Amino acid sequence: PDRTVRSLTITRIVTVNLQTDEIGQYLYRQELPANSNSEMVGLSATDFLVLERDGSFLYGGPNGAAGVTPDAQKQVYRIDLSTGTNLETVALLPGMVQDPDLGLTINGKTLEQVVLEGGWEALAAVGIYPVDKTLALDMVVAANYPHDKMEGLWRIDDSHLGVLNDDDFATWSTGGVLEQKMLDDATIDAGRLY
């Protein structure tokens, strides 16, 4: 595929069974195109918490008041792999091929290209579905999360979850000039555990 598929809501989750070396591959549907999924925490063999975020700052970041983003997305979803199609073991219909370089293709197109041209409905039409997900935590609502990045999840126990930000060493580059990474007009970003 080319760069046109980068701004989609489709991403993949790959699993490896360490006892059998069996590989699984599942689709995850993001809330917004080009969001990031930078962390997963296992709850069981099929249940996971997945971090999903955009790159915006709740209070404007380096752009100050002009960059305020009240709808910033910093969320954790609970997923169940057993609800999605395992792309490694899917029954191949006419036109489907397990390409050694591109993975499962449909009529010569990657799944990303299929979604680009026909939406998620085009995959559903051939029996391919993403994993189900439910919102477990919205950090903007729960903690007024001001950072652009959520990068770490820590399952403390069955009732507590730690969330870590990535402050990029509190630096930011604008036009190639290195400067302090700001959360708003007055606050320098810093690493923090929530």
What is the predicted role of each segment?
Residues 1-194:
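Sequence/structural signature of beta-propeller domains
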